A protein has these predicted regions:
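Membrane-interfacial segments
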Residues: 1, 25, 29, 33, ...
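Core mid-bundle transmembrane helix pairs that form the ion/substrate translocation pathway
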Residues: 1-67
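Hydrophobic, aromatic-rich alpha-helical transmembrane segments
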Residues: 4, 8, 12, 16, ...
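Hydrophobic core segments of alpha-helical transmembrane domains in multi-pass membrane transport
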Residues: 12-24, 57-62, 99-105, 154-162, ...
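Transmembrane alpha-helix interface/packing and boundary motifs in multi-pass membrane proteins
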Residues: 22, 57-69, 80-83, 126-129, ...
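Membrane-interface helix termini and inter-helical loops of multi-pass transporters
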Residues: 30-44, 75-78, 174-190
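Helix-loop-helix junctions within the multi-pass membrane cores of secondary transporters/permeases
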Residues: 73-155
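Transmembrane alpha-helical segments and their short flanking loops
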Residues: 134-259
Length: 259
């Protein structure tokens, strides 16, 4: 092929062939895989119920910590396309409820650590609205054990919502993104909005209580309390010279140096 034609034909054929393979091959396969994943997720929640919700709610905080929760977006979109709402998001949102309950317990267990308490006060409103990263990185993860007990709270909340899914009362969200209290306007289900809101609110309450109880009673060892339940504010140091030492010091300062 002449060089002048090669410059035009080769790139054109490359783009054309790769585009056709992507559109009619890879996209078709990806669509079938996404549909299968969505169907499996729906089957898992309808049959596994409380057990599936327990596992999903319990392991979601580590996914958020690593940023891997973004990989679930295709599953959410597939479920919304198939059913009109995703039943996965309300269960995963229970992890944030466990985190909020754990943070409240930390606040009470560390009354002398004003630094952590200030962080909790500033991050708690965001946590209630479903933004858990400030509480994760600022409170529970640095302490260690409260992060685990927060996962326990999320597991119980997820199990509660998953149980109702197994009983046929699906709780879903019509969009993805928010969680916590911010998810209430987006809730939808197969038994009416009132039932859906009641189940979701009950799951949040279970997550709050379970996260609080687990953290308050099992989230701190004696060594952890001894290390963190102290004031973090610097203590001003004052040097005062009193008594005979000060007097002798003053006298020696006035004496001339010997020759």
């Amino acid at each position: 092929m002449p060089e002048a034609l090669d410059v035009l034909v080769t790139p054109t054929l490359t783009v054309l062939i790769s585009g056709l393979v992507t559109i009619f091959g890879l996209m078709y396969v990806a669509g079938e895989v996404s549909s299968a994943i969505g169907t499996f997720a729906d089957w898992l929640l309808s049959t596994g119920g409380a057990g599936a919700g327990f596992l999903l709610g319990g392991f979601f905080l580590p996914l958020v910590m690593l940023g891997l929760h973004q990989a679930l977006i295709p599953i959410h979109t597939t479920l919304i396309e198939q059913q009109g709402f995703t039943v996965l998001l309300p269960i995963l949102a229970m992890a944030g409820a466990g985190q909020v309950g754990a943070a409240a317990a930390v606040y009470l267990r560390l009354p002398r650590n004003e630094s952590i308490r200030k962080t909790i006060r500033s991050a708690m409103p965001a946590g209630l609205l479903g933004v858990g990263e400030p509480l994760i990185y600022g409170v529970s993860l640095p302490l260690g054990r409260p992060f685990i007990t927060a996962c326990v709270g999320g597991a119980f909340g997820g199990g509660f919502v998953g149980l109702f899914n197994q009983l046929g009362d699906s709780v879903g969200s019509t969009a993805i993104g928010p969680s916590g209290w911010a998810l209430f306007p987006l809730l939808d289900g197969n038994h009416g909005l009132g039932s859906t809101i009641a189940v979701y609110a009950g799951g949040l309450l279970v997550g709050y209580v379970a996260g609080f109880v687990a953290t308050y009673f099992f989230g701190f060892s004696k060594a952890l309390l001894a290390e963190f339940n102290v004031s973090q504010e610097p203590v001003p140091s004052t040097v005062a010279a009193t008594g005979p030492a000060a007097a002798s010091g003053g006298a020696s300062a006035k004496e001339p140096a010997g020759v």
